[in-house]
C-alpha cells in the first residue's frame, strides 16, 4: 500500500542521465508511435467556454487535461480517479503537465517533401537521386512529370516531361506503356526504388577509374550520402512526409489577453494552415474533383508544410495579421533568439541582483560592500532556515513576516548568514574569466555596491555609473569553488600573459610616484662634507624618521642615508646603508621581509611599470597571501600620499616650446621644396604626398620631444633647491593618466589627422589645445574624430563575434593527462624585427617544458628534457648564449580529445604547472578575444610616416664581426656597395663565434659594411629607398632597349603640372599586335652582343608595366647601377590590413587579396611565353622532378630574372603568403610560427601582451582535420577529410591487423569552418547554420558523445572540465569496470551452459 502511495507522488519523471544523443530521420511509424491521437480540426478553443475543441489543436482527449486530476466535463475530479479515462469527454485524469510532452499528428492526404532535405544546401534528395534542385522543385510543385518506368518506350528513366509532352507521349505510346508521376508521390516512389548497395558499388568503381580533377569530388559527395543512409539505418523515402507530428500544446500556448483577444504562438497559425489545406484536399479527393484543382491543392499543402518547418526557405515568407513573418520550427532553433543560444547556453539566474558600483578604498582585497537591503533579499532562504533553527519562528510564514518587518534579530541573523559566505560579482561585458570574481560581502548602508579599487582593472570597471550584478552560490560545493577558485585573492595574475593584474592605477600610482621623487637641495638632506652637523640626514630607525618628517626637519624627497635591516640571501639578518629618500623608506616599510625582496626594489622612481614589477617580485618569492596583504597596504599608502601631495593641473603646466615656430617654418619650407620638386617632375604625386606627410610627422615628433624636455626638466628656486616637478609630467611619466601623445596635443601641436577613409590629410593641425584651433583646423580634427566614434561601435560588435568564434572552436581543448610522452617539439628563438629585439627568447620560453635537454657550452644540462623552464633558469640560458630552444607545444601534443599538461606548460594565472581538467581552450579564446576591443579597425594605407620610416634601413642590435652570405654585391658608379643578389644576407657573429643575427638584404640596398668588419650596436648595416623598387644591372656594359616601341610599350609622359618628360613602360598586352613584345633593357659589350651573367643567362632585365626608365640607350653603366625604378606607390597603395580585421583574416585562414606566390621546390626560374594577360614563369626543381608553372597577373612586379635560383618557400611574387601554402610547402611548424608571429604583431602594435601558447591552442584546433592521400587497406576514400584522432584510431586497428595504414596530410580550416566540423553536432548546431548542421547530422544518424563543454551545458550536465573532469574520469573508469565484469559474467554463464548437458 505504502509503495502505491509513494508511486502516486513520484509522478514527476526523474531526470534521466545519458552518455550520448543520437539524431536521425523519423519514419512515419515512429511519428505515429509518439502521437496520442490525430488532429482533424483546425479549431483551437471554444470562444465562449474557453475549453479546447475536440480533435482540435488543443484537444484535451489527445494531449491531456487542462487542470490537474480533472477531466474536461468535470465528471471525475481529484487524485483518486488517477488514470481513469472519462467515458463522456474521453480525457484521461492525470497531471496537466503531460500537455508539455504529449504529441499529436496530422495524417496527410498526399505526401509532401521535407523542406530541410530538399532545400538545405547541398540538397540531400538531389544528391541522392543525382538530380538538379531545379528539376526536383518542378516535380514537387507540379510543373513537370517524371518518368519512373519507361517500359518499352524511347523515354528515359527520370526524364522530365511537361504537361504537353506527357499528354503527347500518352497518345503516342499508349497510357499503360510507361509510368510517369508528378509531385511528392513521384519522388517518394523513386526514393523507395533506389538500390543503395548497387549505386555505392558503381560510384566506387567510377571514382577509381575517373581521370578528371573535379569529377571525383562530386562523386565522393554522392557516395558519402549514400553510405550515410546505409550505415545510419535511415530510409531515403522518410525524407518525404506522409504524417506531420504536432508538438505538445503547452509548448505553443494560446494565452487569453484582457479584452477578449488571444496571444498565440505562430506555430498554431502554421499548423492551422496545414490542417485546413489537408482537410480541403481530402474533401476534393472524395468528391473526385478535376486533376488540376487537386494538384493545386496538393501544391498548397506542400507550401503550408514548408512554411511550418522553415518559413521563408522557399518562395514568399508567410506573414501573420500584422505583416510580421511567422516564426517556424526552424526559426525557434536558430540565431541569437533561438532555443540553443537563448535558453540552453545562457539562462537567467535566480538569487541575483544588480546595482551601481562605487569605490570602496577601505575594503580588503577579498571584500566587497553589499547593501543591506540587497543582502536581505538575496539570502532570504538562509535567513528563514536560521530563524527557524534559533526558534524565532515556527513556520516559514512567520519567518517571512519577521523579515518583512526587518526586526532587529533579522539583522543579527543576516550577519551570521553572510559570514564566510562568498558572493560573486560580475560586470558585463564579461570578456574573460576575470569578469566574474568572488568576494566576501561586508554589509553597508546605502544602495550601491562597493568595489575594491585594485580589481577594477580585471573587471575593466570605472565609477562613472557602471553597474554590476551579484550572484549567490547556494550549494556547499558552489561556495567552496567560489572561495578556492574565484576569490579575488586567487586571481592576482592575468591568464593571458601571467603578469599581475592587481596593479595600482591612477591616484595610487601618482601617490607612490610622488612618494619616491628625489629633490636636490631639500631641507635636512645628507651632505658628505657637512662640518656643522655630519649626522644630518642619517637615519637608522623608522620612528626617528617619522618624527623628523612630522617636525618638518626633512621632506619626503630629501636625500638621506638610511640603515636598512633585512634578510640576506641565506635568511640571515643583515644591515646595509643606502642613499635614498624618506618617501622611499616609508614605501619600504610595507615590503614583506624576504631575502629575495631587498630595499633596491623600492629604491627607484616608482612608475606604474616599476610598481607592477615590484608586485610580480613579491608574488613570485613571498607567495599569494603576502602579496595580497602587500597590495592592500600599497593601495592605502598611494591614496594617502596622493591626497597629501595635492597635485593639481593648471594651464601653466602646459609648456609650449619656444622654438615651435622655427621648427614649423623649417618644415613649411621643406614642404614647399617638395611641391617644387613635384612641379619640376622629379617626383610623382604619390611620392610627394609621402614625403610631405613624412616631413610633418618628423616636425610633430621634434616638437613633442622639445616639449617633453622642457616639461621634464626640474626648475630651481632662488636658493638652488628643486622646485616641484611639473604636474602634467608627473601624471604622464608615472603612468597614472595621459600619454606623451596626449601631452603633445595639449602643448606642442595636434599633428596630422586622418580622413574617415583612413588616409592622412596632408596639412596638419599646427596649433595645440592650449593655443586653440582655428576654424579649418577644428573642422579637420572633427573629421577624423567622428570616424573614431563610429569605429568604436563597430569594433565592439566585431570583437565580440571574434571571441565567440574562438570560444566555439576551442571549447573542447581541456587538459586530459599529465604527459602525452611525445618527443616532438617546436623551435623557439627571439623575434627580431628591423634589427630590434621585439620578444626575447627568455620571455617566449618561460613556463614551457623542454623537448630535449637544454645544454650549456660546457656540456652541463641547464634544464633536462620534459622539465619546465622557470625564472631561475633564465640567467643560465642567457649566459650560455643559447639562441634557439626546442620546447613542447600543444601543436605537437599527442593526447586524444584534449591536450596534456606538459605540452601546455605553466598555468599563467597561477604561476604553477597547469592542472588536469583546466579548460585551456576557453582561456586561450578569452585571452585573444578580450583585448579585441583595443585593436584598431582601420586598414592602413602605406604612405603614413610610421609605416615607411621604420622600413628603410637596418641597424645592428649586437656587437660582433660581419660575415656576408651568398655574396652578391657590386660597387656602382658612385662607389657604393649595392646588393645585386636576391639572397644576400649579413650575418653578425659574436665574440664567442655564435651567430647573433642574420639580416636578409633588400635587393638594391646600399650596404654600409663589408666582410670581416667589426660592428657596434646601433651601427647602420644597410639602407634603401622605401618609396621605389630598383631594377639593377649586374654587369658593366652598354644599355640597349629591346621591344621598347614608342606608343606601344613605352611612352614619354609629361607631368601636366611640371612639364617634365619621363619614359614609362605602358601596358603592351592590350592589342593582339603587340601582345608578344617583351620590353626589356639589355646590357651589351663593345660589339653589341648581349653580355652573359655569371650564372649563364643573358644580362637582360624584363620591365614590368609602369616602370620608369632611368637610362638612355647607349649609356655606359656599372654593376649595381639603377636601370629603372618601379614606384611602390604606383604598385597601388597596398592596404595593410591591420588590427582586428587582420586577426580575423588569419584565424579564418582566408587567402589574402594579393597573396604572395611561394616556391614549392628549390630550383631555377625561367620565363615562358606569356599567356593572355598573365606572365608565365616556370620553376625547374633541382631534384629533377616535373617543372612547376606559375601564371602571374601582368601588373605584378616579379623581382626575379631568368636563371635566378630560389629555395623552397622563397617568395616569387611579394605579398602576404596564404597560410594554406605555408602549410603545404613548409609544414605545420612553419605555419604555426607564421600565424603566431603575425597575430602577435597586431597585438604588439597596440601594446597588448598575450602568451604564444594561447594562439598555439587555437591553431591546434584549426589543424584537427586530415585529408586522405592514400586510403591504404581501409574503406575510407582518397580526398576525404576526417578527424586527426579518428585517423589515429583507424590506423592503430589496421596496423594491429597487419594491413596497410591510411596516409593523410593536415588541412588548415578557418575557425568558423572548424567549429562547424566538430564531431559534436549539438555544439555545431548551436554555433551557426543550425538547419544545415542538423539536416546533415540526421542523414548521417550522428551520435554525440557529449565530450566537449558546450554540448554538456546544453543537455544540462556537469561540464567535463575542472571538478566535472574528475567526475567524468570516475564515470569512465566505472563504465570500463562494468564492461569487464559483464564480459566475465557472460563468459562464466557460457561455460556453465556448456556443462549443463553433461550433468544430465
Curated annotation (Swiss-Prot):
The keyword Metal-binding applies. Zn(2+) 2 binds at residues 820, 893, 900, 903. SUPFAM superfamilies: beta and beta-prime subunits of DNA dependent RNA-polymerase. It catalyses: RNA(n) + a ribonucleoside 5'-triphosphate = RNA(n+1) + diphosphate. CDD domains: RNAP_beta'_C, RNAP_beta'_N. Pfam families: RNA_pol_Rpb1_1, RNA_pol_Rpb1_2, RNA_pol_Rpb1_3, RNA_pol_Rpb1_4, RNA_pol_Rpb1_5. GO terms for cellular component: DNA-directed RNA polymerase complex. GO terms for molecular function: DNA binding; DNA-directed RNA polymerase activity; magnesium ion binding; zinc ion binding. HAMAP family: RNApol_bact_RpoC. Zn(2+) 1 binds at residues 71, 73, 86, 89. Belongs to the RNA polymerase beta' chain family. This is DNA-directed RNA polymerase subunit beta'. The keyword Lyase does not apply. InterPro entries: DNA-dir_RpoC_beta_prime, DNA-dir_RpoC_beta_prime_bact, RNA_pol_asu, RNA_pol_N, RNA_pol_Rpb1_1, RNA_pol_Rpb1_3, RNA_pol_Rpb1_3_sf, RNA_pol_Rpb1_4. Its cofactor is Mg(2+); Zn(2+). Mg(2+) binds at residues 462, 464, 466. The RNAP catalytic core consists of 2 alpha, 1 beta, 1 beta' and 1 omega subunit. When a sigma factor is associated with the core the holoenzyme is formed, which can initiate transcription. Its EC number is 2.7.7.6. DNA-dependent RNA polymerase catalyzes the transcription of DNA into RNA using the four ribonucleoside triphosphates as substrates. SMART domains: RPOLA_N. Keywords: DNA-directed RNA polymerase, Magnesium, Metal-binding, Nucleotidyltransferase, Transcription, Transferase, Zinc. GO terms for biological process: DNA-templated transcription.
Amino acid at each position: 500500500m505504502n509503495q502505491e502511495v509513494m508511486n502516486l507522488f513520484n509522478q514527476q519523471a526523474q531526470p534521466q542521465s545519458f552518455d550520448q544523443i543520437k539524431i536521425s530521420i523519423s519514419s512515419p511509424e515512429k511519428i505515429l508511435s509518439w502521437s496520442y491521437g490525430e488532429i482533424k480540426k483546425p479549431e483551437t478553443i471554444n470562444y465562449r467556454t474557453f475549453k479546447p475543441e475536440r480533435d482540435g489543436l488543443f484537444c484535451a482527449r489527445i494531449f491531456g487535461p487542462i487542470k490537474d486530476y480533472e477531466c474536461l466535463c468535470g465528471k471525475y475530479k481529484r487524485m483518486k480517479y488517477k488514470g481513469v479515462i472519462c467515458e463522456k469527454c474521453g480525457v484521461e485524469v492525470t497531471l496537466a503537465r503531460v500537455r508539455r510532452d504529449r504529441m499529436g499528428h496530422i495524417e496527410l492526404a498526399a505526401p509532401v517533401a521535407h523542406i530541410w532535405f530538399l532545400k538545405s544546401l547541398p540538397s540531400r534528395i538531389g544528391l541522392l537521386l543525382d538530380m538538379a534542385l531545379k528539376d526536383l522543385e518542378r516535380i514537387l510543385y507540379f510543373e513537370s512529370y517524371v518518368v519512373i518506368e519507361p517500359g518499352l518506350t524511347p523515354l528515359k528513366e527520370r526524364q522530365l516531361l511537361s504537361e504537353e509532352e506527357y499528354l503527347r507521349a500518352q497518345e503516342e505510346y499508349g497510357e499503360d506503356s510507361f509510368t510517369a508521376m508528378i509531385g511528392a508521390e513521384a519522388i517518394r516512389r523513386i526514393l523507395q526504388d533506389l538500390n543503395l548497395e548497387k549505386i555505392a558499388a558503381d560510384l566506387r568503381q567510377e571514382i577509381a577509374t575517373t581521370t578528371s580533377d573535379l569529377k571525383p569530388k562530386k562523386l565522393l559527395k554522392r557516395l558519402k550520402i549514400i553510405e550515410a543512409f546505409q550505415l545510419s539505418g535511415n530510409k531515403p523515402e522518410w525524407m518525404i512526409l506522409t504524417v506531420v507530428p504536432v508538438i505538445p500544446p503547452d509548448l505553443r500556448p494560446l494565452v487569453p489577453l484582457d479584452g477578449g483577444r488571444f496571444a498565440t504562438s505562430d506555430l498554431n497559425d502554421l499548423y492551422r494552415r496545414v490542417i485546413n489545406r489537408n482537410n480541403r484536399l481530402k474533401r476534393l479527393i472524395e468528391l473526385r474533383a478535376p486533376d488540376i484543382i487537386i494538384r493545386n491543392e496538393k501544391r498548397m499543402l506542400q507550401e503550408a508544410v514548408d512554411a511550418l518547418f522553415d518559413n521563408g526557405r522557399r518562395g514568399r515568407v508567410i506573414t501573420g495579421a500584422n505583416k510580421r513573418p511567422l516564426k517556424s520550427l526552424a526559426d525557434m532553433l536558430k540565431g541569437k533568439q533561438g532555443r540553443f543560444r537563448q535558453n540552453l547556453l545562457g539562462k537567467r539566474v535566480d538569487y541575483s541582483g544588480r546595482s551601481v558600483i562605487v569605490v570602496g578604498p577601505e575594503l580588503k582585497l577579498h571584500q566587497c560592500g553589499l547593501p543591506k537591503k540587497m543582502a536581505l533579499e538575496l539570502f532570504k532562504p538562509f535567513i528563514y532556515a536560521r530563524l527557524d533553527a534559533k526558534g524565532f519562528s515556527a513556520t516559514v510564514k512567520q519567518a517571512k513576516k519577521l523579515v518583512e518587518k526587518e526586526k532587529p534579530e533579522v539583522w543579527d541573523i543576516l550577519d551570521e548568514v553572510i559570514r564566510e559566505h562568498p558572493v560573486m560579482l560580475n560586470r558585463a561585458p564579461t570578456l574573460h574569466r576575470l569578469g566574474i570574481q568572488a568576494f566576501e560581502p561586508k554589509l553597508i548602508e546605502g544602495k550601491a555596491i562597493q568595489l575594491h579599487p585594485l580589481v577594477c582593472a580585471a573587471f575593466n570597471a570605472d565609477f562613472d555609473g557602471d553597474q554590476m550584478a551579484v550572484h549567490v552560490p547556494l550549494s556547499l560545493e558552489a561556495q567552496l569553488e567560489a572561495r578556492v577558485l574565484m576569490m579575488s585573492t586567487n586571481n592576482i595574475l592575468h591568464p593571458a600573459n601571467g603578469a599581475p593584474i592587481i596593479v595600482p592605477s591612477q591616484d595610487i600610482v601618482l601617490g607612490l610616484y610622488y612618494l619616491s621623487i628625489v629633490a636636490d637641495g631639500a631641507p635636512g638632506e645628507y651632505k658628505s662634507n657637512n662640518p656643522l652637523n655630519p649626522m644630518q640626514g642619517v637615519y637608522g630607525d623608522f620612528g626617528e624618521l617619522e618624527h623628523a618628517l612630522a617636525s618638518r626637519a626633512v621632506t619626503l624627497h630629501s636625500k638621506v642615508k638610511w640603515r636598512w635591516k633585512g634578510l640576506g640571501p641565506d635568511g640571515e639578518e643583515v644591515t646595509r646603508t643606502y642613499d635614498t629618500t624618506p618617501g622611499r623608506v616609508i614605501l619600504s616599510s610595507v615590503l614583506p621581509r624576504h631575502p629575495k625582496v631587498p630595499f633596491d626594489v623600492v629604491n627607484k622612481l616608482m612608475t606604474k611599470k616599476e610598481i607592477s614589477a615590484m608586485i610580480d617580485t613579491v608574488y613570485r618569492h613571498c607567495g599569494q597571501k603576502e602579496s595580497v596583504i602587500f597590495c592592500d597596504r600599497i593601495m592605502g599608502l598611494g591614496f594617502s600620499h596622493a591626497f597629501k601631495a595635492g597635485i593639481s593641473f593648471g594651464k601653466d603646466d602646459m609648456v609650449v616650446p619656444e622654438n615651435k615656430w622655427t621648427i614649423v617654418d623649417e618644415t613649411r619650407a621643406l614642404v614647399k621644396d617638395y611641391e617644387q620638386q613635384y612641379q619640376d617632375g622629379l617626383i610623382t604625386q604619390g611620392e610627394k604626398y609621402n614625403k610631405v606627410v613624412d616631413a610633418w610627422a618628423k616636425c610633430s615628433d621634434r616638437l613633442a620631444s622639445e616639449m617633453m624636455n622642457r616639461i621634464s626638466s626640474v626648475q630651481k628656486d632662488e636658493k638652488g633647491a628643486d622646485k616641484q616637478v611639473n604636474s602634467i609630467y608627473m601624471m604622464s611619466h608615472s603612468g597614472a593618466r595621459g600619454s606623451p601623445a596626449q601631452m603633445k596635443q595639449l602643448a606642442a601641436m595636434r599633428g596630422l589627422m586622418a580622413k574617415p577613409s583612413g588616409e592622412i590629410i596632408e596639412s596638419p593641425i599646427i596649433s595645440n589645445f592650449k593655443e586653440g584651433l582655428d576654424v579649418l583646423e577644428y573642422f579637420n580634427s572633427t573629421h577624423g574624430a567622428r570616424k573614431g566614434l563610429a569605429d568604436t561601435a563597430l569594433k565592439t560588435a566585431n570583437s565580440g563575434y571574434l571571441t565567440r568564434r574562438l570560444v566555439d572552436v576551442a571549447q573542447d581543448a581541456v587538459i586530459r593527462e599529465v604527459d602525452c610522452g611525445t618527443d616532438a617539439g617546436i623551435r623557439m628563438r627571439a623575434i627580431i624585427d628591423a634589427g630590434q629585439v621585439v620578444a626575447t627568447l627568455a620571455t617566449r620560453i618561460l613556463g614551457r617544458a623542454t623537448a630535449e635537454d637544454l645544454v650549456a657550452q660546457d656540456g652541463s644540462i641547464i634544464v633536462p628534457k620534459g622539465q619546465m623552464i622557470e625564472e631561475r633558469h633564465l640567467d643560465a640560458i642567457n649566459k650560455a648564449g643559447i639562441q634557439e630552444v626546442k620546447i613542447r607545444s600543444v601543436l605537437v601534443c599527442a593526447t586524444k580529445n584534449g591536450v596534456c599538461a606538459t605540452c601546455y606548460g605553466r598555468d599563467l594565472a597561477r604561476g604553477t604547472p597547469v592542472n588536469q581538467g583546466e579548460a585551456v581552450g576557453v582561456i586561450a579564446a578569452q585571452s585573444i578575444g578580450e583585448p579585441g576591443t583595443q585593436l584598431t579597425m582601420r586598414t592602413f594605407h602605406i604612405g603614413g610616416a610610421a609605416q615607411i620610416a621604420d622600413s628603410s634601413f637596418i641597424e645592428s642590435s649586437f656587437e660582433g664581426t660581419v660575415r656576408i652570405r651568398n655574396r652578391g654585391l657590386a660597387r656602382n658608379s658612385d662607389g657604393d656597395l649595392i646588393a645585386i643578389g636576391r639572397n644576400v644576407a649579413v650575418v653578425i657573429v659574436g665574440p664567442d663565434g655564435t651567430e647573433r643575427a642574420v639580416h636578409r638584404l633588400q635587393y638594391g640596398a646600399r650596404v654600409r659594411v663589408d666582410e670581416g668588419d667589426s660592428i657596434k650596436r646601433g651601427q647602420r648595416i644597410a639602407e634603401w629607398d622605401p618609396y621605389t623598387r630598383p631594377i639593377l644591372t649586374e654587369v658593366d656594359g652598354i644599355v640597349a632597349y629591346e621591344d621598347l616601341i614608342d606608343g606601344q610599350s613605352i611612352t614619354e609622359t609629361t607631368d601636366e603640372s611640371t612639364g617634365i618628360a619621363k619614359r614609362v613602360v605602358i601596358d603592351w598586352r592590350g592589342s593582339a599586335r603587340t601582345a608578344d613584345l617583351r620590353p626589356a633593357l639589355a646590357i651589351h659589350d663593345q660589339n653589341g652582343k648581349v653580355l652573359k651573367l655569371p650564372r649563364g643567362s643573358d644580362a637582360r632585365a624584363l620591365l614590368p608595366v609602369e616602370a620608369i626608365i632611368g637610362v638612355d640607350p647607349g649609356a655606359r653603366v656599372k654593376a649595381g647601377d639603377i636601370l629603372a625604378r618601379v614606384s611602390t606607390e604606383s604598385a597601388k597603395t597596398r592596404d595593410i590590413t591591420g588590427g582586428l580585421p587582420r586577426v580575423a583574416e588569419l584565424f579564418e585562414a582566408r587567402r589574402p587579396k594579393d597573396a604572395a606566390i611561394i616556391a614549392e621546390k628549390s630550383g631555377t626560374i625561367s620565363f615562358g611565353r606569356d599567356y593572355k594577360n598573365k606572365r608565365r614563369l616556370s620553376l625547374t626543381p633541382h631534384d629533377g622532378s616535373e617543372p612547376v608553372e606559375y601564371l602571374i597577373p601582368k601588373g605584378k612586379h616579379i623581382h626575379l630574372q631568368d636563371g635566378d635560383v630560389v629555395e623552397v618557400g622563397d617568395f616569387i611574387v611579394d605579398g602576404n603568403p596564404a597560410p594554406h601554402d605555408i602549410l603545404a610547402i613548409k609544414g605545420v611548424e612553419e605555419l604555426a610560427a607564421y600565424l603566431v608571429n603575425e597575430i602577435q604583431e597586431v597585438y604588439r602594435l597596440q601594446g597588448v601582451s598575450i602568451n604564444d601558447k594561447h594562439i598555439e591552442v587555437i591553431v591546434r584546433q584549426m589543424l584537427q582535420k586530415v585529408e586522405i592521400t592514400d586510403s591504404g587497406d581501409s574503406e575510407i576514400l582518397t580526398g576525404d577529410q576526417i578527424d586527426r584522432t579518428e585517423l589515429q584510431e583507424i590506423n592503430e586497428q589496421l596496423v594491429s591487423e597487419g594491413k596497410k595504414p591510411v596516409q593523410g596530410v593536415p588541412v588548415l580550416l578557418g575557425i568558423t569552418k572548424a567549429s562547424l566540423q566538430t564531431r559534436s553536432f549539438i555544439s555545431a548546431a548551436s554555433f551557426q547554420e543550425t538547419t544545415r548542421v542538423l539536416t546533415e547530422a540526421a542523414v548521417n544518424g550522428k551520435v554525440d558523445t557529449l565530450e566537449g563543454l558546450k554540448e554538456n551545458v546544453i543537455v544540462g550536465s556537469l561540464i567535463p572540465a575542472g571538478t566535472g573532469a574528475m567526475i567524468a574520469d570516475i564515470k569512465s573508469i566505472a563504465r570500463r569496470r562494468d564492461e569487464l565484469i559483464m564480459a566475465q559474467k557472460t563468459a562464466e554463464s557460457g561455460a556453465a551452459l556448456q556443462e549443463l548437458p553433461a550433468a544430465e
